[in-house]
Amino acid sequence: MRVDAIAKVTGRARYTDDYVMAGMCYAKYVRSPIAHGYAVSINDEQARSLPGVLAIFTWEDVPDIPFATAGHAWTLDENKRDTADRALLTRHVRHHGDAVAIVVARDELTAEKAAQLVSIEWEELPVITTPEAALAEDAAPIHNGGNLLKQSTMSTGNVQQTIDAADYQVQGHYQTPVIQHCHMESVTSLAWMEDDSRITIVSSTQIPHIVRRVVGQALDIPWSCVRVIKTFVGGGFGNKQDVLEEPMAAFLTSKLGGIPVKVSLSREECFLATRTRHAFTIDGQMGVNRDGTLKGYSLDVLSNTGAYVSHGHSIASAGGNKVAYLYPRCAYAYSSKTCYTNLPSAGAMRGYGAPQVVFAVESMLDDAATALGIDPVEIRLRNASREGDANPLTGKRIYSAGLPECLEKGRKIFEWEKRRAECQNQQGNLRRGVGVACFSYTSNTWPVGVEIAGARLLMNQDGTINVQSGATEIGQGADTVFSQMVAETVGVPVSDVRVISTQDTDVTPFDPGAFASRQSYVAAPALRSAALLLKEKIIAHAAVMLHQSAMNLTLIKGHIVLVERPEEPLMSLKDLAMDAFYHPERGGQLSAESSIKTTTNPPAFGCTFVDLTVDIALCKVTINRILNVHDSGHILNPLLAEGQVHGGMGMGIGWALFEEMIIDAKSGVVRNPNLLDYKMPTMPDLPQLESAFVEINEPQSAYGHKSLGEPPIIPVAAAIRNAVKMATGVAINTLPLTPKRLYEEFHLAGLI
């Protein structure tokens, strides 16, 4: 059972918005109704006269200090730092919902009413919604320096020549949508001051230690003067890997004498003013021989980062790096540009660029298989990454690669050959199709980012162990896995290990936070090191108490035993702990601490199999069966792993078939910033979700495991697209596959 299960299902778990303090005030933004322009004048007299309003701040009142918001590890290299293009409030609005002022009031309703009473005169500027328009010679600059944020290329050599020399070439133009994370808990931060020099922030964040640093930078105060407390988090999926409302909450309390100020965003504001997934436009080429050997492929990517940089070009760059592991024995070229537009800012979202890139690669490979008459599973087996291969861009060796086994296992469970045969030569309105797609994904951010994790273990008087880690639990089950790691390594029952889920930057060992599917991989060495050290101290103390050599003793199921007679307990940990605490001379509280940097980053692999039916007349896709098979190394907790995979599959189905932020191409106004008009899949839309695992030990890992949090979403859309193509003969390269888009494509193909 998850260690946080009871607290959550009984309602005892306290999330940020559950915290109410005496004298607490509430802040609400005044936001731009236009996507690009200047606030010429502002009139807040009516708002200020409303009873209960404490203060109104505009762009003129906030520090003139640009700051970056991305949840990336800090770097000593100035050239590698994120672009600082944010301000707390701005006169130059760059997207629909940009913030120009903020109202603080005694209660939330008054703050909302007052914000609505603020009137602003606007000077509108040209609106740009696509990267193509942003790069036009006559495009209005959204930021100083132009609309091209960054561009990069990576290549294994003369890739175009290799593609041209192959027996068959395939090309494709692919487009993916802007979508929102839609985590259950919205974005909330609460800040106050206990003295004149220090600000405390309680926040729903994935990255408390990074929040501390960014708040310090935004307000130009020492980082140590900021304390960040992360409570229970109701999901993030990357949106809370940005520093969102914490700097504003900190600014407000500092200006209002240290009183508690809460900044909570509505669901509509989460759509407009937090982060989204980057929309990609990808032009791809691929060369394949008649026997199915992939000779080479190239991708040219345009990434839409929206109005502010956030994670910016790192998304496009990461997508190209992560897919390189998938089919490493071929030539590979990847070029990408990231552009500013007047859309809501895009940032990190589950998969971090990989879903977009994999959609293009796996669509092209499937089209090549169809043209060459090769089974889609066979062409992937022929080219799949294997142990001993190397990343073609970096030369990093792949020590564990279970992709062939995933394909074979999935093919058997899914009954691929039988289902594929049933889908041949179909006529009529209802047509079935099967599809498959693969992925590769890394286990942290190294070497692009510094990977560090810390752990502290303290033994209580009853022999139980408290664990403090900077790695954040945000709903994915990290605390449960951490308790298993410590319990196994020390030699105690899991029930005797308590992970302190609340991170506090004043107390908790340093860790950047939850992102990049890094948590269990990067935290594991620190937890294991601390656990081994604590075990060593326990046995040393037991040796003194029992007049034994420490070499003769070990710890099993919470009891000290002789190595040669493990079935006979000599002493319980409770008895040992009481002696360590209260013996008049020997001992002390037994504890251990470790901080370790990780310099390995193995890839995980896997695939999705899908069986679906297309109703051509209704332009509707119904998924009959879907299966994900993963190589994530040793599976630490099968139930948690299954839950992660099912959640990712559901998100992948949403991205493939339903979800899209509808943004007016001319005005930049978001037309569906709510959960009624933004179509997410609900229970009736999802089939039975199936998962399976291929457990191949990863030798670079502390416990033999690799990434699992993000990978399940990555191949789903491509597999669905490929199945729709098999069912209808129509290759649709733009997501999502909504009824409207299916109608347009089927009409062009002459099916309707």
Curated annotation (Swiss-Prot):
Associated pathway: Purine metabolism; hypoxanthine degradation; urate from hypoxanthine: step 1/2; Purine metabolism; hypoxanthine degradation; urate from hypoxanthine: step 2/2
EC number, UniProt record: 1.17.1.4
Residues spanning the membrane: none
Keywords, ordered alphabetically: Metal-binding, Molybdenum, NAD, Oxidoreductase, Purine metabolism, Purine salvage
Catalytic reaction(s) noted: xanthine + NAD(+) + H2O = urate + NADH + H(+); hypoxanthine + NAD(+) + H2O = xanthine + NADH + H(+)
InterPro entries in the record: Ald_Oxase/Xan_DH_a/b, Ald_Oxase/Xan_DH_a/b_sf, Ald_Oxase/xanthine_DH-like, AldOxase/xan_DH_MoCoBD1, AldOxase/xan_DH_MoCoBD2, AldOxase/xan_DH_Mopterin-bd_sf, XdhA_XDHase
Family membership: Belongs to the xanthine dehydrogenase family.
UniProt function note: Presumed to be a dehydrogenase, but possibly an oxidase. Participates in limited purine salvage (requires aspartate) but does not support aerobic growth on purines as the sole carbon source (purine catabolism).
Subunit-level organization: Heterotrimer of XdhA, XdhB and XdhC.
Name of this chain's protein: Xanthine dehydrogenase molybdenum-binding subunit
Gene: xdhA
